Amino acid sequence: ETPRSNILAYTLSTGELVEGFAPALNGPGRALALSDDGRTLYVAGGFNQVDGKWHNNLAAFDLSNGGALIDSFKPVFNTTVSTIDVVGSTVYAGGYFKSVNGQPRLGLAAVDASTGATLDWTASISGINAQVYGLRVSPDGTKVVVGGSFQAINGSSNPGYGLALLDANTAQILPTPVNSQIRNAGRYGAIYDVAVDDNGFYGTGYSMSISEANIEGAFKADWNGQLIWLEPCHGDTYSVYPTASEVYVTNHAHSCQTIGGFADTRLPSGHLDYKAGLALTNSPDVTIGTQGTDGYYDW
């Protein structure tokens, strides 16, 4: 075995470990993002030291210099950063934190990509179990889509109940009509992940109570926030990766009857047969024909 401490790199073509990249995080790494030029790797998570040096929940590495830790980039998030994205000179961050560099920031913040200084971009999440799990910037750099378990952003719960579009320059909440349909937040539900392309944004969700959260599955909306399609296959859905023609999701789906797919089946043990992932067509031609089983939300 080759020791690694919460982060590693491997070659895509072979799967072989990259021996020269071995920073040590003293807590979990949760998100990665590259600078526009591909020279700087940003790593977020629940750590306060990297290679024995103080770096609080966000660090940067110089890939043009063998992945060396960039000591000068040292923003101080008071606790976990769960998701990040980088555009130009700005690193956007979401998580469970309450302050950045000593300044109040409730779950959402932006810092300078070189210095780590706190930027004026300020949006505040609130509610029971308020956290941000997914954050991505639109390809044109004008909007930020965020998802999580928060019940409001800047005091707004529609949009803002687990999902919202924000202005990338001002952090002002933008019209997100899909949030009138997709409602996942609170103690028993969340939007777990978001992804983007030129045509819109994608999200995934889980629900333990349809009174607080109504989708287990994935969805796509356009950049005006209008719903394009959704697949309510029953089972927590964790991440999403879109291409032009397909969408890949990781989950534990057990019934896709809602869109004419497989029904619940049981293993010889009697337990439900959960899938670990699905591939879907990236198309609005999805017909939701039945509610499915076990009292799930009826789309």
Regions found by a protein language model. Give the residues of each.
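Extracytoplasmic surface signature
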Residues: E1-W299
